[in-house]
Amino acid sequence: MALKTDIRGMVWRYSDYFIVGREQCREFARAIKCDHPAYFSEDAAAELGYDAIVAPLTFVTIFAKYVQLDFFRNVDVGMETMQIVQVDQRFVFHKPVLVGDKLWARMDIHSVSERFGADIVVTKNSCTSDDGELVMEAYTTLMGQQGDNSSQLKWDKESGQVIRSA
């Protein structure tokens, strides 16, 4: 295992906040082909009982990417040329994300292990509002290996998983 196991149990708090933008939500909804009116119109969101445009469910991945990049930029994980593939993710929403929300993030490293020559890291990512209320949690599994191309990873359509080939 090339990845440092002492990151297990580590808590990484993203030092900045993320404000959910109106046009950013609309652009994201268009990009992922979500055409629900609540993603575009304050009036449509109000009809559903919300004070602002609702962000698409996967919108928080933008913020999550900032948090992951910050972590890998600032924490010595033991590999300089690591190739990382996200192999699983699960979201648990506690409340909707709305335009204007000020969000904070924390990433907990739950486990670090090695399988088939690749390092597997499982994280729990928590997103809270400016007043500390839990908005959502994401459980992410990352697989990484040294960037020497000694093995190749590819997506297997039949199994729906990332597999390693020689």
UniProtKB/Swiss-Prot annotation:
NCBIfam families to which the protein is assigned, alphabetical: PRK13691.1
Top-rank taxon: Bacteria
Name of the molecule in the record: UPF0336 protein ML1908
Species this protein is from: Mycobacterium leprae (strain TN)
Family of this protein: Belongs to the UPF0336 family.
GO molecular function per UniProt: (3R)-hydroxyacyl-[acyl-carrier-protein] dehydratase activity
Alphabetical GO biological process terms: fatty acid biosynthetic process
